[in-house]
Amino acid sequence: DKHSLALYTNGVECMDEIPDSYDHDKICFVGNMRTLQNQDAVLHFVNDIFPLILKKKPGARFYIIGAEPPRNIMALAEKSENIVVTGFVDVLSDAVKDSCVAVAPVQIAAGIQNKVLVAMGMGVPVVMSSLISKAIPELESGTNCIIEDADQAFADACLRMMDNEADRNRISRSGYDTVRKYYSWQEKLSGYDHLNADS
């Protein structure tokens, strides 16, 4: 019966509220590190973008949060005290929610990126490449995220989130509201009970 069918697209868990405080020096990347596109994005950030941030913010720290990091990703933390590789974490929100900004400089296409939605659903603003933004039509640079492709512009956007609390909190709130409205499981499954009752 077609009336008993429903389509549920991609969704993520959203926090009930945006955290009141955050670590101004913490930048994070969220994603399963066994995938090529995530490894490539992290290496691109570490090699080409993070050094530009460290010139202005020598205390900045980059957290690579995700299961199954290969040896070359693990080695990044051994080479720099400013880089932390967490590997798998039991409670993702505990590792992500206090970040000042999340980054997604993805250069290899891979559909909708949960890494972006997860961070935004925790109230963490995201700086991302235009490639990754194309999979999420509700995104608007400067409103609910920041979209940059050039290395210096990407670094500058991260620095702005670290330096300008009002701007950071504005994008944090808008991003959180966007994900909660369009991509949260809470919203997507709100009609499930009605569907089940009618079956």
Label the predicted regions.
Residues K2, A6-D98:
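Conserved catalytic-core segment of nucleotide-activated headgroup transferases in glycan assembly
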Residues S130-I147:
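Short acidic/histidine- and often glycine-rich active-site loop of Leloir-type glycosyltransferases
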Residues K115-A119, P125-S129:
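Short hydrophobic beta-strand element within catalytic cores of glycosyltransferases
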Residues N144-Q152, R160-E165:
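Conserved acidic donor-binding segment of nucleotide-sugar-dependent glycosyltransferases
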Residues V12, R34-Q37, G111, I146, ...:
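Glycosyltransferase donor-binding loop in the core domain
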Residues D90, Q107-A109, P125, L131-K134, ...:
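Flexible glycine-rich beta->alpha loop in the catalytic core of nucleotide-sugar glycosyltransferases
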Residues R160, D167-K181, K188-H194:
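A short, well-ordered alpha-helix in the C-terminal region of glycosyltransferases
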Residues N82, K97-G111, M122-P125:
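Acidic donor-binding loop of glycosyltransferase active sites
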